[in-house]
Amino acid sequence: MLDAKLLRTDLDNIAQQLTKRNFVLDTEALSALEELRKAIQVKTQELQNERNTRSKSIGQAKARGEDIAPLLAHVSQLGNDLDAAKTEQDEVLAKIDAIASAIPNLLDDSVPEGKDEDDNVEVKRWGTPREFDFEVKDHVDLGFSVDKGLDFESGAKLAGTRFVVMRGKIARLHRAIAQFMLDTHTEEHGYQEMYVPYLVNAASLYGTGQLPKFGEDLFHTDLSNKKFSLIPTSEVPLTNLVRDEIVDEDDLPIKMTAHTPCFRSEAGSGGRDIRGLIRQHQFDKVEMVQIVKPETSMTALDELTRHAEIILEKLELPYRTVQLCSGDVGFSAAKTFDLEVWLPAQDTYREISSCSNMGAFQARRMQARFRNNETNKPELLHTLNGSGLAVGRTLVAILENYQQADGSINVPTVLQPYMGGLTNIG
C-alpha cells in the first residue's frame, strides 16, 4: 500500500507516476472522499468538544440546584449525533481504503518504460542452447515415455485439467530438483529453511497484495465460519511472518526459503499453455524471501536474483535475465527481474523465476517494522521475494535440454547424488 500521507498531499504526482503502469487513478473520486473525510473529521471534533463542554455544565447546573433534564437531553442528542458522524467517517474511510488497496506500488526510477512484456529489457544471457542432431521432443512426450512418469490423463481423472500425476524416476527427479535447490540456498546462500502452512487467512493475503484485487486467482475454502485460501506462493506465509512485528535492526537481513506446493486458479490465462507442466493449478516452487533495511533493498534484489541464476548455472541450463518494463511489473513490486530458461521444444526462453523488490509496499500493509538503532524509532521494512526456482518448470527444462536420441534423459551432474547415482533415466 502507498503512503496515505502521499496520497493526500501529492495525489497528482502519484497519478502521473502510475500512468507508467497503464494504471489510471481516479483522482477526482479520491479527492472528493478526502475532502468529505476532512469535513466529517472537523464536525466530529466539534461535536466531541461541545459534548464535553455540556457534560461539564451539567455538574455545575446540578450544584446550583437547576433543572438538568434539558441539559441531559441535549448531551444525549450530541452523543447520538457524534455516533452518526463517526459511522459516516468510518464509511468514508472504508471507501478511501478500498481505492487505496487497489493502487499498485510506485515503480523504481530505474525501471524502463514500456507497455507489456514485449518491451522488457534483456540484461544478461548465459549458456548456449544445445544443437540437436535428432528431432526434439517436448517434455510431455519425454516424461510419459519414462515409465509414464508424467501422466496428465490420470491427473485429469483425479482432479481435472492442469493437473498431473508423476511416478517413478520422474517423480524422484522432481523431488531431487527441490532438494538440490533448498540445499544450495541454505548451505551456500545463507537462507533459513522454513516449513509453512499451505492454507492462509485473508489478512496474510492482504499483507502481500493478493487481496482484495486478485481474489479470483486463488482457491478458497469455506469451512463453517472459517475461511482460508490455498497459497499461490510461499511468499505469502514467509513474508507475513513479520506482520505486526517490530524486528530488531541487528536481526536484519532475514533470509528465508521454503519448498511448497502452490495453487493458482489461472483465471486470466484463457487457453494458454494447456499442454504440459508450464501452467498448472498445482505446482511446486522453492521460494526465497528477504526482509531488509530500506537502504539495502536494491542490493538485496541483485543478490536474490543472482541466487536464482546460480541454480540454473549449476544445472547447466541456458537462460537469460530480463528487467521488466513499467507495464509488466507486478502489482506489489517496485522493480523486477525475470529469469527465462531455454526450452528446445518451444525454441524460446520461458519464465522460470521472478525476483522482485517490493520496497515498503507490503510492509505498510502488514505494519512490519524494525527498530532503528540510532533513533530507537520503528521504521517500515523492505521486503523482497523470488523463485529459486519453480520446480515443475525446472523439470521441463531438464527433460528437454538433457534428452537423448533414444528418448532417455541424462541426469544433470549436480542432481546425481540426489538420484542415488543415476546418470540417465529412461
UniProtKB/Swiss-Prot annotation:
Compartment(s) of residence: Cytoplasm
**Which UniProt keywords are given for this protein, alphabetically ordered?**
Aminoacyl-tRNA synthetase, ATP-binding, Cytoplasm, Ligase, Nucleotide-binding, Protein biosynthesis
- Which GO MF terms does the UniProt record name? ATP binding; serine-tRNA ligase activity
Domain comment? Consists of two distinct domains, a catalytic core and a N-terminal extension that is involved in tRNA binding.
Q: Which family does it belong to?
A: Belongs to the class-II aminoacyl-tRNA synthetase family. Type-1 seryl-tRNA synthetase subfamily.
The job of this chain, per UniProt, is described as: Catalyzes the attachment of serine to tRNA(Ser). Is also able to aminoacylate tRNA(Sec) with serine, to form the misacylated tRNA L-seryl-tRNA(Sec), which will be further converted into selenocysteinyl-tRNA(Sec).
Q: What is this protein's record name?
A: Serine--tRNA ligase
Give me the gene this protein comes from: serS
